[in-house]
Amino acid sequence: MGFVVPPYPHDRLNAGRTRAAERWGSAIDLSIGTPCDPPPAAVVEALSTSNTERGYPTSLGSPRYRGAAAGWLARRLGSIVDPATEVAACIGTKEFVATTPQFLKLRTPERDTVLYPAVAYPTYAMGAALAGCRAVGVPVDNAWRLDLSAIDPADAARALCLWVNTPGNPAGGLDDLEAAATWGRTNGVTVLSDECYAEFTWDGPPRSILAHGTEGVLAVHSLSKRSNLAGMRAGYASGVKPAHEPRI
């Protein structure tokens, strides 16, 4: 039969959305985090005046783009990274989430498991499926935080990566990022921190896993949520020297 693409979870909601509209006339759709506010005026202006700027970008992103990303991380999260060696552009972080297990498996073919929060964004499991890997949900506690102590040692030994997402989608849990980084280093597992909601906090400063060092971790950032630029397919990863890790 070969590989059969599994149905995307959002598509499975279409029937329920239709039934709700038929019964009540409309539905409050919480299935996807599409921003409803306008993008920053400066971005709209820049896009409207860039129609003559065409060309293929470098695979890692231009030095200007990576420098801007590193500057944002420093200003907003207090994370200091080297834009030349610790930042890489990605064409949308959803694509990064969905494809990274494939590249990690090329590097470490003896491992075949993707760990991710049991209550989470569906693309973590989808990325595992596309790579031919096992998708293993890590239990969360009553506050929706990742319970690292619940990871089966057998799964840890087979893990390519561990996804963390804080504040978490959809429940808003706040993970212990230092504990996640330490767990990854102890078990030789790359920790991928999806930080697209990092600034969505009720109080207190936003947090990044990069505050606990770049060894063995990658922080993934998107412009879709925090800048109301969904569909622009712009993001970047920062951490374990991605510029020197061509397979990541």
How should each PLM-predicted stretch be described?
Residues G127-A128, W183, I209:
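Hydrophobic/aromatic ligand-binding patch that stacks against planar heteroaromatic rings
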Residues D112, T186-V189, E215:
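A short helix->loop->beta-strand "cap" motif at the edges of active sites that frequently abuts
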Residues G213-I248:
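Conserved core segment of the aminotransferase class I/II
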